[in-house]
Amino acid sequence: MNFETIIGLEVHAELNTNSKIFSPSSAHFGEDPNANTNVIDWSFPGVLPVMNKGVIDASIKAALALNMDIHKEMHFDRKNYFYPDNPKAYQISQFDEPVGYNGWIEIKLEDGSTKKIRIERAHLEEDAGKNTHGTDGYSYVDLNRQGVPLIEIVSEADMRSPEEAYAYLTALKEIIQYTGISDVKMEEGSMRVDANISLRPYGQEQFGTKTELKNLNSFSNVRKGLEFEVERQAKLLRSGGVIRQETRRYDEANKGTILMRVKEGAADYRYFPEPDLPLYEIDDAWIDEMRAQLPQFPAQRRAKYEEELGLSAYDASQLTATKVLSDFFETAVSLGGDAKQVSNWLQGEIAQFLNAEGKTIEEIALTPENLVEMIAIIADGTISSKMAKKVFVHLAKNGGSARAYVEKAGLVQISDPAVLVPIIHQVFADNEAAVADFKSGKRNADKAFTGFLMKATKGQANPQVAQQLLAQELQKLRD
Protein backbone atom coordinates (compact mmCIF):
# COMPACT_ATOMS: atom_id res chain seq x y z
CA MET A 1 0.00 0.00 0.00
CA ASN A 2 1.22 3.47 -0.87
CA PHE A 3 0.67 6.46 1.39
CA GLU A 4 0.29 10.19 0.92
CA THR A 5 2.41 12.37 3.21
CA ILE A 6 0.64 15.17 5.09
CA ILE A 7 2.80 17.87 6.72
CA GLY A 8 2.04 21.01 8.69
CA LEU A 9 4.61 23.28 10.33
CA GLU A 10 4.62 25.48 13.42
CA VAL A 11 7.26 28.20 13.34
CA HIS A 12 8.20 30.35 16.33
CA ALA A 13 9.99 33.60 15.53
CA GLU A 14 11.39 35.83 18.27
CA LEU A 15 10.49 39.46 17.62
CA ASN A 16 13.47 41.81 17.71
CA THR A 17 12.03 44.43 20.03
CA ASN A 18 14.34 46.19 22.47
CA SER A 19 12.38 45.02 25.51
CA LYS A 20 10.27 42.00 26.37
CA ILE A 21 6.60 41.57 25.64
CA PHE A 22 5.29 42.30 29.16
CA SER A 23 8.30 43.68 31.06
CA PRO A 24 10.88 46.44 30.50
CA SER A 25 13.81 43.99 30.63
CA SER A 26 16.08 43.90 27.60
CA ALA A 27 15.30 41.25 25.00
CA HIS A 28 18.90 41.25 23.68
CA PHE A 29 20.45 37.84 22.96
CA GLY A 30 23.76 36.66 24.39
CA GLU A 31 23.95 38.32 27.83
CA ASP A 32 25.15 36.64 31.03
CA PRO A 33 22.57 34.31 32.62
CA ASN A 34 19.68 36.18 34.26
CA ALA A 35 21.17 39.59 33.41
CA ASN A 36 18.07 40.60 31.43
CA THR A 37 15.47 39.95 34.12
CA ASN A 38 13.34 41.77 36.68
CA VAL A 39 10.53 41.04 39.12
CA ILE A 40 8.00 40.49 36.31
CA ASP A 41 10.23 37.86 34.69
CA TRP A 42 10.74 36.25 38.10
CA SER A 43 6.96 36.23 38.69
CA PHE A 44 7.08 37.92 42.07
CA PRO A 45 3.67 38.07 43.77
CA GLY A 46 1.63 41.13 42.87
CA VAL A 47 3.52 42.16 39.72
CA LEU A 48 1.45 42.80 36.59
CA PRO A 49 2.32 42.56 32.89
CA VAL A 50 2.44 45.71 30.74
CA MET A 51 1.95 45.28 26.99
CA ASN A 52 4.78 46.34 24.66
CA LYS A 53 3.15 48.24 21.77
CA GLY A 54 6.07 47.41 19.50
CA VAL A 55 5.09 43.75 19.72
CA ILE A 56 1.61 44.48 18.39
CA ASP A 57 3.15 46.58 15.61
CA ALA A 58 5.35 43.64 14.62
CA SER A 59 2.47 41.16 14.72
CA ILE A 60 0.38 43.34 12.41
CA LYS A 61 3.28 43.55 9.95
CA ALA A 62 3.67 39.77 10.04
CA ALA A 63 -0.04 39.21 9.42
CA LEU A 64 -0.02 41.61 6.47
CA ALA A 65 3.13 40.08 4.99
CA LEU A 66 1.53 36.63 5.16
CA ASN A 67 -1.69 37.77 3.45
CA MET A 68 -3.74 37.24 6.62
CA ASP A 69 -6.97 38.65 7.96
CA ILE A 70 -6.45 40.55 11.22
CA HIS A 71 -8.59 40.34 14.34
CA LYS A 72 -9.55 43.89 15.23
CA GLU A 73 -9.82 43.00 18.93
CA MET A 74 -6.73 41.48 20.50
CA HIS A 75 -6.82 39.61 23.77
CA PHE A 76 -4.56 37.13 25.53
CA ASP A 77 -5.05 33.80 27.29
CA ARG A 78 -3.26 31.75 29.93
CA LYS A 79 -1.76 28.42 28.90
CA ASN A 80 -1.20 26.49 32.13
CA TYR A 81 1.73 24.15 32.60
CA PHE A 82 4.58 23.74 35.09
CA TYR A 83 8.23 23.68 34.16
CA PRO A 84 11.26 25.20 35.94
CA ASP A 85 11.90 27.71 33.12
CA ASN A 86 8.33 29.00 33.46
CA PRO A 87 8.15 30.49 36.98
CA LYS A 88 4.51 31.67 36.70
CA ALA A 89 3.39 28.09 35.93
CA TYR A 90 1.49 29.53 32.97
CA GLN A 91 2.36 31.16 29.67
CA ILE A 92 0.57 34.24 28.33
CA SER A 93 -0.47 33.36 24.79
CA GLN A 94 -3.40 33.70 22.36
CA PHE A 95 -5.76 30.76 22.01
CA ASP A 96 -9.10 31.27 20.26
CA GLU A 97 -8.45 34.65 18.60
CA PRO A 98 -4.96 34.96 17.11
CA VAL A 99 -3.79 38.27 15.72
CA GLY A 100 -3.84 36.88 12.16
CA TYR A 101 -5.74 34.09 10.41
CA ASN A 102 -6.53 32.68 6.94
CA GLY A 103 -3.19 33.57 5.35
CA TRP A 104 -1.03 32.07 2.62
CA ILE A 105 2.36 32.21 0.93
CA GLU A 106 3.63 30.78 -2.34
CA ILE A 107 6.53 28.35 -2.50
CA LYS A 108 8.64 27.39 -5.49
CA LEU A 109 8.91 23.67 -6.19
CA GLU A 110 11.87 21.79 -7.61
CA ASP A 111 10.30 21.63 -11.09
CA GLY A 112 9.99 25.42 -11.17
CA SER A 113 6.25 25.52 -10.53
CA THR A 114 4.66 27.29 -7.56
CA LYS A 115 2.25 26.12 -4.88
CA LYS A 116 0.16 28.08 -2.40
CA ILE A 117 0.51 26.99 1.24
CA ARG A 118 -2.27 28.18 3.51
CA ILE A 119 -1.50 29.57 6.96
CA GLU A 120 -4.09 28.86 9.63
CA ARG A 121 -3.04 31.44 12.21
CA ALA A 122 -0.33 33.64 13.66
CA HIS A 123 -0.49 34.40 17.38
CA LEU A 124 1.62 36.17 19.98
CA GLU A 125 3.03 34.63 23.13
CA GLU A 126 5.91 34.99 25.55
CA ASP A 127 8.95 32.76 25.35
CA ALA A 128 10.06 30.57 28.25
CA GLY A 129 13.46 30.59 29.95
CA LYS A 130 16.17 28.04 29.34
CA ASN A 131 17.21 25.06 31.46
CA THR A 132 20.82 23.88 31.48
CA HIS A 133 21.65 20.51 33.02
CA GLY A 134 25.15 20.56 34.48
CA THR A 135 27.59 17.71 34.93
CA ASP A 136 27.58 18.44 38.67
CA GLY A 137 24.10 16.97 39.06
CA TYR A 138 22.37 20.35 39.23
CA SER A 139 20.09 22.01 36.70
CA TYR A 140 20.33 25.76 36.14
CA VAL A 141 17.61 28.14 34.96
CA ASP A 142 18.37 31.22 32.85
CA LEU A 143 15.38 33.58 32.59
CA ASN A 144 16.92 35.96 30.05
CA ARG A 145 14.66 34.45 27.39
CA GLN A 146 11.61 34.44 29.66
CA GLY A 147 9.15 36.99 28.28
CA VAL A 148 10.91 37.58 24.96
CA PRO A 149 8.10 38.14 22.44
CA LEU A 150 7.29 35.33 20.04
CA ILE A 151 5.00 35.06 17.07
CA GLU A 152 3.92 31.51 16.27
CA ILE A 153 2.95 30.90 12.65
CA VAL A 154 0.91 27.75 12.10
CA SER A 155 0.48 26.43 8.58
CA GLU A 156 -2.34 24.28 7.32
CA ALA A 157 -1.37 20.68 6.55
CA ASP A 158 -0.84 21.54 2.88
CA MET A 159 2.66 20.16 2.32
CA ARG A 160 2.99 16.75 0.71
CA SER A 161 6.71 16.06 1.00
CA PRO A 162 9.75 17.00 3.09
CA GLU A 163 10.99 18.99 0.07
CA GLU A 164 7.83 21.13 0.12
CA ALA A 165 8.30 21.70 3.86
CA TYR A 166 11.88 22.87 3.19
CA ALA A 167 10.68 25.23 0.45
CA TYR A 168 7.97 26.62 2.76
CA LEU A 169 10.46 27.36 5.53
CA THR A 170 12.83 29.04 3.10
CA ALA A 171 10.07 31.28 1.74
CA LEU A 172 8.66 32.05 5.19
CA LYS A 173 12.08 32.95 6.60
CA GLU A 174 12.70 35.33 3.68
CA ILE A 175 9.38 37.10 4.21
CA ILE A 176 9.76 37.48 7.99
CA GLN A 177 13.35 38.68 7.60
CA TYR A 178 12.29 41.25 5.00
CA THR A 179 9.68 42.72 7.36
CA GLY A 180 12.45 43.45 9.87
CA ILE A 181 10.46 42.05 12.80
CA SER A 182 12.87 39.15 13.47
CA ASP A 183 16.37 38.12 12.44
CA VAL A 184 15.10 34.48 12.23
CA LYS A 185 18.46 32.94 13.20
CA MET A 186 17.97 29.28 14.09
CA GLU A 187 21.49 29.11 15.54
CA GLU A 188 20.49 31.72 18.16
CA GLY A 189 17.03 30.27 18.77
CA SER A 190 15.19 33.22 17.25
CA MET A 191 13.53 30.83 14.80
CA ARG A 192 12.33 27.42 15.91
CA VAL A 193 10.36 24.81 14.00
CA ASP A 194 8.03 22.01 15.05
CA ALA A 195 6.67 19.68 12.38
CA ASN A 196 3.46 17.65 12.34
CA ILE A 197 3.40 14.69 9.99
CA SER A 198 0.94 11.92 9.22
CA LEU A 199 0.33 9.42 6.42
CA ARG A 200 -2.90 8.31 4.77
CA PRO A 201 -3.65 5.88 1.94
CA TYR A 202 -3.93 7.62 -1.42
CA GLY A 203 -7.55 8.49 -2.11
CA GLN A 204 -8.52 8.73 1.58
CA GLU A 205 -9.78 12.16 2.68
CA GLN A 206 -9.40 11.74 6.45
CA PHE A 207 -5.99 12.55 7.88
CA GLY A 208 -4.02 9.89 9.68
CA THR A 209 -2.81 10.20 13.28
CA LYS A 210 -0.12 12.85 13.43
CA THR A 211 3.28 12.82 15.08
CA GLU A 212 4.94 16.03 16.24
CA LEU A 213 8.68 16.44 15.66
CA LYS A 214 10.88 18.66 17.82
CA ASN A 215 14.61 19.40 18.19
CA LEU A 216 14.79 20.48 14.56
CA ASN A 217 17.64 22.97 14.72
CA SER A 218 18.13 23.55 10.98
CA PHE A 219 16.08 23.41 7.80
CA SER A 220 18.21 20.45 6.75
CA ASN A 221 17.28 18.57 9.92
CA VAL A 222 13.61 19.38 9.37
CA ARG A 223 13.84 17.65 6.01
CA LYS A 224 15.84 14.70 7.39
CA GLY A 225 13.49 14.23 10.34
CA LEU A 226 10.44 14.25 8.08
CA GLU A 227 12.08 11.82 5.64
CA PHE A 228 12.78 9.43 8.52
CA GLU A 229 9.20 9.71 9.79
CA VAL A 230 7.77 8.97 6.34
CA GLU A 231 9.72 5.71 6.28
CA ARG A 232 9.03 4.84 9.94
CA GLN A 233 5.29 5.41 9.74
CA ALA A 234 4.89 3.69 6.36
CA LYS A 235 6.75 0.62 7.61
CA LEU A 236 4.64 0.53 10.78
CA LEU A 237 1.35 0.87 8.89
CA ARG A 238 2.27 -1.79 6.33
CA SER A 239 3.06 -4.22 9.14
CA GLY A 240 -0.39 -3.68 10.69
CA GLY A 241 0.79 -1.35 13.44
CA VAL A 242 -0.96 1.76 14.75
CA ILE A 243 0.44 5.30 14.79
CA ARG A 244 0.10 6.98 18.18
CA GLN A 245 -0.30 10.74 18.64
CA GLU A 246 3.05 11.50 20.21
CA THR A 247 5.93 13.93 20.29
CA ARG A 248 9.30 12.75 19.00
CA ARG A 249 12.64 14.50 18.74
CA TYR A 250 15.13 14.28 15.92
CA ASP A 251 18.44 12.68 16.94
CA GLU A 252 21.06 14.09 14.59
CA ALA A 253 23.72 11.60 15.64
CA ASN A 254 21.56 8.58 14.81
CA LYS A 255 19.70 10.25 11.90
CA GLY A 256 16.35 9.22 13.36
CA THR A 257 13.53 10.23 15.69
CA ILE A 258 13.11 9.23 19.33
CA LEU A 259 9.94 9.20 21.44
CA MET A 260 9.71 12.06 23.95
CA ARG A 261 6.14 11.83 25.26
CA VAL A 262 2.56 11.11 24.34
CA LYS A 263 1.19 14.30 22.81
CA GLU A 264 -0.97 16.57 24.94
CA GLY A 265 -4.12 18.25 23.67
CA ALA A 266 -5.39 21.81 24.24
CA ALA A 267 -7.54 20.62 27.14
CA ASP A 268 -4.40 19.61 29.03
CA TYR A 269 -3.35 23.27 29.19
CA ARG A 270 -6.67 24.55 30.65
CA TYR A 271 -6.70 27.77 28.61
CA PHE A 272 -8.67 30.70 30.00
CA PRO A 273 -8.66 34.48 29.30
CA GLU A 274 -5.73 36.41 30.78
CA PRO A 275 -7.29 38.59 33.52
CA ASP A 276 -4.33 40.98 33.94
CA LEU A 277 -4.34 42.36 30.38
CA PRO A 278 -7.06 44.45 28.73
CA LEU A 279 -8.59 44.12 25.27
CA TYR A 280 -6.59 45.94 22.58
CA GLU A 281 -8.40 47.56 19.66
CA ILE A 282 -6.63 47.41 16.29
CA ASP A 283 -8.26 49.92 13.96
CA ASP A 284 -7.80 50.44 10.21
CA ALA A 285 -5.52 53.45 10.73
CA TRP A 286 -3.11 51.33 12.77
CA ILE A 287 -3.13 48.59 10.13
CA ASP A 288 -2.56 51.11 7.32
CA GLU A 289 0.35 52.64 9.23
CA MET A 290 2.03 49.22 9.51
CA ARG A 291 1.29 48.38 5.86
CA ALA A 292 3.05 51.57 4.76
CA GLN A 293 6.22 50.40 6.54
CA LEU A 294 6.44 47.08 4.69
CA PRO A 295 9.09 46.66 1.99
CA GLN A 296 8.77 45.04 -1.41
CA PHE A 297 9.07 41.30 -0.76
CA PRO A 298 11.41 38.75 -2.39
CA ALA A 299 8.94 37.39 -4.96
CA GLN A 300 8.18 40.86 -6.30
CA ARG A 301 11.87 41.79 -6.35
CA ARG A 302 12.83 38.61 -8.21
CA ALA A 303 10.20 39.32 -10.85
CA LYS A 304 11.50 42.88 -11.24
CA TYR A 305 15.13 41.76 -11.55
CA GLU A 306 14.25 39.25 -14.26
CA GLU A 307 11.73 41.31 -16.24
CA GLU A 308 13.15 44.83 -15.91
CA LEU A 309 16.87 44.24 -15.38
CA GLY A 310 17.29 41.14 -17.54
CA LEU A 311 18.88 38.96 -14.86
CA SER A 312 18.52 35.18 -14.79
CA ALA A 313 16.18 33.48 -12.35
CA TYR A 314 19.25 32.13 -10.52
CA ASP A 315 20.82 35.58 -10.16
CA ALA A 316 17.53 37.08 -8.99
CA SER A 317 17.14 34.34 -6.38
CA GLN A 318 20.68 34.81 -5.04
CA LEU A 319 20.33 38.59 -4.83
CA THR A 320 17.09 38.41 -2.83
CA ALA A 321 18.38 35.86 -0.31
CA THR A 322 18.49 38.63 2.31
CA LYS A 323 16.97 42.08 2.37
CA VAL A 324 20.33 43.70 3.14
CA LEU A 325 21.90 42.17 0.03
CA SER A 326 18.90 43.06 -2.13
CA ASP A 327 18.88 46.64 -0.85
CA PHE A 328 22.62 46.95 -1.56
CA PHE A 329 22.07 45.71 -5.13
CA GLU A 330 19.15 48.05 -5.76
CA THR A 331 21.03 51.05 -4.42
CA ALA A 332 24.03 50.28 -6.64
CA VAL A 333 21.81 49.97 -9.72
CA SER A 334 19.99 53.20 -8.86
CA LEU A 335 23.39 54.95 -8.80
CA GLY A 336 24.06 53.89 -12.37
CA GLY A 337 25.75 50.54 -11.85
CA ASP A 338 25.20 47.95 -14.57
CA ALA A 339 22.84 45.35 -13.09
CA LYS A 340 24.74 42.33 -14.43
CA GLN A 341 28.13 43.70 -13.38
CA VAL A 342 26.87 44.53 -9.87
CA SER A 343 25.28 41.07 -9.65
CA ASN A 344 28.50 39.36 -10.73
CA TRP A 345 30.55 41.20 -8.11
CA LEU A 346 28.04 40.49 -5.33
CA GLN A 347 27.93 36.79 -6.14
CA GLY A 348 31.63 36.47 -6.93
CA GLU A 349 34.45 38.34 -5.21
CA ILE A 350 32.23 39.96 -2.57
CA ALA A 351 30.54 36.67 -1.60
CA GLN A 352 33.92 34.93 -1.36
CA PHE A 353 35.30 37.71 0.83
CA LEU A 354 32.27 37.63 3.14
CA ASN A 355 32.49 33.85 3.52
CA ALA A 356 36.20 34.00 4.29
CA GLU A 357 35.74 36.78 6.85
CA GLY A 358 32.54 35.33 8.35
CA LYS A 359 30.74 38.62 7.86
CA THR A 360 27.63 39.98 6.18
CA ILE A 361 27.70 42.79 3.65
CA GLU A 362 26.57 45.43 6.15
CA GLU A 363 29.55 44.54 8.37
CA ILE A 364 32.21 45.57 5.84
CA ALA A 365 33.21 49.07 4.75
CA LEU A 366 32.23 48.68 1.09
CA THR A 367 29.24 50.81 0.06
CA PRO A 368 27.12 50.69 -3.11
CA GLU A 369 28.74 53.99 -4.14
CA ASN A 370 32.22 52.46 -3.79
CA LEU A 371 31.26 49.43 -5.88
CA VAL A 372 29.67 51.46 -8.67
CA GLU A 373 32.74 53.71 -8.88
CA MET A 374 35.05 50.68 -9.02
CA ILE A 375 33.02 49.09 -11.83
CA ALA A 376 33.18 52.42 -13.71
CA ILE A 377 36.99 52.66 -13.53
CA ILE A 378 37.26 49.09 -14.78
CA ALA A 379 35.04 50.00 -17.72
CA ASP A 380 37.02 53.14 -18.62
CA GLY A 381 40.33 51.29 -18.47
CA THR A 382 41.72 52.99 -15.37
CA ILE A 383 42.32 49.57 -13.77
CA SER A 384 42.21 45.99 -15.05
CA SER A 385 39.76 43.37 -13.83
CA LYS A 386 42.67 41.61 -12.12
CA MET A 387 43.78 44.78 -10.34
CA ALA A 388 40.17 45.44 -9.33
CA LYS A 389 40.28 42.46 -6.98
CA LYS A 390 43.04 44.15 -4.99
CA VAL A 391 41.14 47.43 -5.03
CA PHE A 392 37.99 45.68 -3.78
CA VAL A 393 39.76 44.15 -0.78
CA HIS A 394 41.00 47.61 0.22
CA LEU A 395 37.51 49.08 -0.12
CA ALA A 396 35.95 46.22 1.84
CA LYS A 397 38.33 46.82 4.73
CA ASN A 398 38.70 50.60 4.61
CA GLY A 399 35.96 52.09 2.42
CA GLY A 400 36.58 55.34 0.59
CA SER A 401 36.80 56.30 -3.07
CA ALA A 402 37.98 53.62 -5.48
CA ARG A 403 39.48 56.17 -7.88
CA ALA A 404 41.28 58.06 -5.11
CA TYR A 405 42.80 54.83 -3.76
CA VAL A 406 43.93 53.69 -7.21
CA GLU A 407 45.65 57.02 -7.91
CA LYS A 408 47.28 57.21 -4.47
CA ALA A 409 48.53 53.62 -4.61
CA GLY A 410 49.88 54.00 -8.14
CA LEU A 411 47.60 51.32 -9.56
CA VAL A 412 46.37 53.22 -12.59
CA GLN A 413 46.52 50.99 -15.65
CA ILE A 414 49.04 52.02 -18.35
CA SER A 415 47.28 52.20 -21.71
CA ASP A 416 49.29 54.88 -23.52
CA PRO A 417 51.37 53.38 -26.39
CA ALA A 418 53.85 56.22 -25.99
CA VAL A 419 54.61 54.88 -22.51
CA LEU A 420 54.37 51.15 -23.24
CA VAL A 421 56.44 50.90 -26.44
CA PRO A 422 59.69 52.12 -24.82
CA ILE A 423 59.13 49.64 -21.98
CA ILE A 424 58.66 46.86 -24.56
CA HIS A 425 61.94 47.82 -26.21
CA GLN A 426 63.66 47.70 -22.82
CA VAL A 427 62.15 44.23 -22.22
CA PHE A 428 63.68 43.07 -25.52
CA ALA A 429 67.05 44.52 -24.50
CA ASP A 430 66.92 42.83 -21.08
CA ASN A 431 65.93 39.42 -22.46
CA GLU A 432 68.24 38.76 -25.41
CA ALA A 433 67.95 34.97 -25.08
CA ALA A 434 64.17 35.11 -25.38
CA VAL A 435 64.51 37.40 -28.41
CA ALA A 436 66.89 34.90 -30.00
CA ASP A 437 64.44 32.04 -29.34
CA PHE A 438 61.66 34.04 -30.95
CA LYS A 439 63.72 34.93 -34.02
CA SER A 440 64.72 31.27 -34.45
CA GLY A 441 61.07 30.26 -34.53
CA LYS A 442 61.00 28.40 -31.21
CA ARG A 443 57.46 27.30 -30.34
CA ASN A 444 55.54 29.68 -27.98
CA ALA A 445 58.60 31.87 -27.51
CA ASP A 446 56.45 34.97 -27.95
CA LYS A 447 54.34 34.18 -24.88
CA ALA A 448 57.22 34.85 -22.49
CA PHE A 449 57.25 38.52 -23.38
CA THR A 450 53.79 39.09 -21.90
CA GLY A 451 55.08 38.05 -18.50
CA PHE A 452 58.23 40.13 -18.87
CA LEU A 453 56.16 43.22 -19.73
CA MET A 454 53.69 42.77 -16.87
CA LYS A 455 56.62 42.34 -14.45
CA ALA A 456 58.30 45.46 -15.80
CA THR A 457 55.12 47.51 -15.33
CA LYS A 458 54.28 45.88 -11.95
CA GLY A 459 51.07 44.55 -13.44
CA GLN A 460 49.84 47.97 -14.54
CA ALA A 461 50.01 47.47 -18.30
CA ASN A 462 46.58 47.29 -19.92
CA PRO A 463 46.49 43.60 -21.03
CA GLN A 464 44.58 44.25 -24.26
CA VAL A 465 46.74 47.21 -25.32
CA ALA A 466 49.91 45.41 -24.22
CA GLN A 467 49.10 42.33 -26.33
CA GLN A 468 48.42 44.47 -29.38
CA LEU A 469 51.63 46.49 -29.02
CA LEU A 470 53.73 43.39 -28.29
CA ALA A 471 52.44 41.74 -31.44
CA GLN A 472 53.38 44.82 -33.46
CA GLU A 473 56.88 45.12 -31.99
CA LEU A 474 57.56 41.38 -32.27
CA GLN A 475 56.56 41.50 -35.90
CA LYS A 476 59.18 44.23 -36.41
CA LEU A 477 61.78 41.92 -34.85
CA ARG A 478 60.80 39.15 -37.26
CA ASP A 479 60.97 41.50 -40.23
Swiss-Prot record:
<dbReference type="InterPro" id="IPR018027">
    <property type="entry name" value="Asn/Gln_amidotransferase"/>
</dbReference>
<dbReference type="InterPro" id="IPR017959">
    <property type="entry name" value="Asn/Gln-tRNA_amidoTrfase_suB/E"/>
</dbReference>
<dbReference type="GO" id="GO:0050567">
    <property type="term" value="F:glutaminyl-tRNA synthase (glutamine-hydrolyzing) activity"/>
</dbReference>
<dbReference type="InterPro" id="IPR042114">
    <property type="entry name" value="GatB_C_1"/>
</dbReference>
<dbReference type="Pfam" id="PF02934">
    <property type="entry name" value="GatB_N"/>
</dbReference>
<dbReference type="GO" id="GO:0070681">
    <property type="term" value="P:glutaminyl-tRNAGln biosynthesis via transamidation"/>
</dbReference>
<dbReference type="InterPro" id="IPR017958">
    <property type="entry name" value="Gln-tRNA_amidoTrfase_suB_CS"/>
</dbReference>
<comment type="function">
    <text>Allows the formation of correctly charged Asn-tRNA(Asn) or Gln-tRNA(Gln) through the transamidation of misacylated Asp-tRNA(Asn) or Glu-tRNA(Gln) in organisms which lack either or both of asparaginyl-tRNA or glutaminyl-tRNA synthetases. The reaction takes place in the presence of glutamine and ATP through an activated phospho-Asp-tRNA(Asn) or phospho-Glu-tRNA(Gln).</text>
</comment>
<dbReference type="InterPro" id="IPR023168">
    <property type="entry name" value="GatB_Yqey_C_2"/>
</dbReference>
<dbReference type="InterPro" id="IPR004413">
    <property type="entry name" value="GatB"/>
</dbReference>
<dbReference type="GO" id="GO:0005524">
    <property type="term" value="F:ATP binding"/>
</dbReference>
<dbReference type="InterPro" id="IPR003789">
    <property type="entry name" value="Asn/Gln_tRNA_amidoTrase-B-like"/>
</dbReference>
<dbReference type="Pfam" id="PF02637">
    <property type="entry name" value="GatB_Yqey"/>
</dbReference>
<comment type="similarity">
    <text>Belongs to the GatB/GatE family. GatB subfamily.</text>
</comment>
<keyword id="KW-0648">Protein biosynthesis</keyword>
<dbReference type="InterPro" id="IPR006075">
    <property type="entry name" value="Asn/Gln-tRNA_Trfase_suB/E_cat"/>
</dbReference>
<keyword id="KW-0547">Nucleotide-binding</keyword>
<comment type="subunit">
    <text>Heterotrimer of A, B and C subunits.</text>
</comment>
<dbReference type="InterPro" id="IPR014746">
    <property type="entry name" value="Gln_synth/guanido_kin_cat_dom"/>
</dbReference>
<protein>
    <recommendedName>
        <fullName>Aspartyl/glutamyl-tRNA(Asn/Gln) amidotransferase subunit B</fullName>
        <ecNumber>6.3.5.-</ecNumber>
    </recommendedName>
</protein>
<keyword id="KW-0067">ATP-binding</keyword>
<dbReference type="GO" id="GO:0050566">
    <property type="term" value="F:asparaginyl-tRNA synthase (glutamine-hydrolyzing) activity"/>
</dbReference>
<keyword id="KW-0436">Ligase</keyword>
<dbReference type="GO" id="GO:0006412">
    <property type="term" value="P:translation"/>
</dbReference>
